[in-house]
Design a protein with these regions (language model features):
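Hydrophobic core
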Residues: 10-19
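N-terminal low-complexity, Pro/Thr/Ser-rich intrinsically disordered segments
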Residues: 30-52
């Protein structure tokens, strides 16, 4: 039997520096030395996989799989085959439990030199894993992730599975937290499910953004907090359901709301109704709430609605008609963007707050009416492709009305219809184009026309 040499940390470091610089310490292989006092932060390697020591107490400790910097390098024999992360590894007389997946551990990056990079077809995560760190599976080529029975996983950090080729995943009951953009841009993801006894409480911002194959999702009753833009630019969802008994959220015909319905969070992009009316309780349309919808032609917003969020109707490509209520006070940035079929828009009297580029790229918009109490319009209020725009009606009569030099980026053929000489003067001094400005008399009998 080969005698094992025991070295002090100092001696081992000197020998390694002299003969194999920058190489990790190997464990449990015939040619490797075993460190007697493995420390927190040490990098060890076993079966070609690197681990980083997280804790040590006597002869037991914990490690993360992966060094936290570079991906695991799989061998040719592992390519396209299932791979299981070990529950424990042994280093000399010490036993370490694998409790975390390190950042970048199972990320995939094509080699810039053209060298073949091998990767397994599926990865099984043992019950001992409690955390998947940021970008742990970024760009992963595994089609399936499997969690062992009795999983203790509590946290999936930001971007853990983003840009992956994952096709399906069933998340364990123990999971409590899903980080920002955790599954975003995983374009092949078709099935994502939660355990019926899920403990999940928080899903962070854009966790399921930019997905093109996920058709349905049911949120567990345990969820208490959802981040913003959860389904931003996701193009495949037909309905989002909420498990019965959830105290924070509700689903009505596949549309996701806060429990009291005051916030409409998401109207699925592939929900195939051509018309829709928001519930009477709704006060806010969340950012990206109707984005990428492919069917909706007519939308009636309820009285009592106060706020339309950023990109709320972005790329709702079939939307032809929308009714905005007098209760509306805020329309955020790019709320109307890429609405290819919208022909007319009437902004009600009481809107006080506008984001930049609130209307951008409306190629079939012919007429815009700006309500009576709207006193100020921001930069880039109306911009982008506006090839069909013929007229803008400004109903305001106040001497406080103001616009900026770059409020209207519009064709010169567009005519303004205003209620007073003051409004005309405000426009004349700020327009960069020579648009007709027509002052409409109260009795509608006589009109005065001027060219700015």
């Amino acid at each position: 039997m080969k005698k094992t040499t025991i070295l002090s940390l100092t001696t081992a470091a000197v020998i390694l520096a002299a003969y194999v610089p920058n190489e990790p310490i190997l464990a449990d292989t015939p040619s490797s030395e075993v460190i007697k006092e493995t420390k927190v932060g040490s990098i060890i390697q076993q079966n070609n996989i690197k681990y980083k020591v997280l804790t040590v107490e006597g002869n037991i400790g914990t490690v993360q799989v992966g060094n936290g910097v570079t991906p695991v390098e799989f061998e040719a024999g592992q390519d396209g085959k299932p791979f299981t992360i070990p529950t424990k590894i042994t280093v000399g007389d010490k036993v370490f439990t694998v409790t975390e997946v390190a950042s970048q551990a199972f990320s995939y990056y094509p080699d810039e030199t053209g060298r073949i990079v091998y990767y397994p077809s599926s990865i099984t995560i043992p019950s001992s894993i409690k955390k998947i760190q940021k970008k742990g599976f970024h760009g992963s080529k595994a089609k399936t992730i499997i969690f062992d029975k009795g999983s203790q996983l509590e946290k999936i950090e930001d971007r853990a599975f983003d840009f992956s080729e994952l096709e399906e995943i069933e998340l364990p009951a123990s999971l409590e937290y899903i980080g920002t953009s955790a599954f975003s841009f995983s374009q092949k993801l078709k099935k994502l499910t939660f355990s019926s006894s899920s403990k999940l409480e928080l899903i962070s911002h854009e966790a399921f953004a930019n997905l093109s194959n996920l058709e349905k999702l049911t949120l567990p009753k345990s969820v208490k907090t959802l981040g913003s833009n959860l389904f931003r630019l996701t193009t495949s969802l037909k309905h989002v359901d909420v498990e019965e008994g959830n105290e924070s959220f509700a689903s009505v015909d596949g549309v996701l709301f806060s429990k009291d319905k005051t916030q409409l969070i998401y109207y699925p992009s592939q929900k195939n109704d051509e018309s829709y009316k928001t519930p009477k309780e709704t006060k806010e349309l969340a950012s990206y709430s109707f984005n990428k919808n492919s069917y909706l032609k007519k939308l009636e917003l309820n009285g009592g609605l106060e706020k339309i969020g950023t990109f709320a109707f972005a790329d709702a490509i079939k939307l032809e008609e929308i009714s905005l209520p007098n209760s509306l006070e805020t329309i955020e940035r790019l709320a109307f963007y890429g609405n290819l079929e919208l022909k007319e828009l009437i902004l009600p009297d009481n809107v006080k707050n506008f984001g930049k580029h609130v209307m951008n790229g409306l190629p079939k918009l012919k007429s815009l009416t700006i309500g009576n109490n709207i006193n100020s319009l921001p930069s880039f209020f109306l911009s982008g492709v506006l090839d069909s725009l013929k007229e803008i009606h400004i109903k305001n009569k106040s001497t406080e009305f103001s616009v900026k030099k770059d409020t209207f980026a519009i064709p010169e053929t567009v005519k303004f219809y205003v209620t007073s000489e003051h409004i005309k003067d405000v426009l004349k001094s700020n327009l960069s184009t020579s648009n007709d400005i027509i002052v409409e008399k109260v009795d509608n009998i006589k009109q005065e026309t001027d060219v700015a």
